[in-house]
Amino acid sequence: MLDLVKYPVITQKTYIALFKDRQYTFDVDLRLTKPQIKKVFETLFNVDVISVNTHIPPRQKIRVGLAQGYRPRYKRAIITLKEGQSINYSLKNDN
């Protein structure tokens, strides 16, 4: 289930939304739907999710030498949490 959530997005805009509206931004697998994203975050981080907003950014063309291609597709999910709850980014696996 952890492989469905790729990584958190930390920019100035998401940092402001984090403290202002309790909104966390993550890049998730492209195949997930909003109810699936909500269920993943509620079970993985043990929080109550109020809403899930998603969008798929446009593909970016990359070029290395003569070879051209595209960056991998992903879905960006904006998660709004219940009052007084937070997500700890530093989940560690003790393997």
UniProtKB/Swiss-Prot annotation:
Subcellular localization: Plastid, Chloroplast
Entry-linked InterPro entries: Nucleotide-bd_a/b_plait_sf, Ribosomal_uL23-like, Ribosomal_uL23/eL15/eS24_sf
Disulfide pattern: none
Stored Gene3D superfamilies: 3.30.70.330
A molecular-function term among this protein's GO annotations: rRNA binding
Signal peptide feature range: none
Predominant cellular place of this UniProt entry's protein: plastid
UniProt protein name: Large ribosomal subunit protein uL23c
Origin organism lineage: Eukaryota, Viridiplantae, Chlorophyta, core chlorophytes, Chlorophyceae
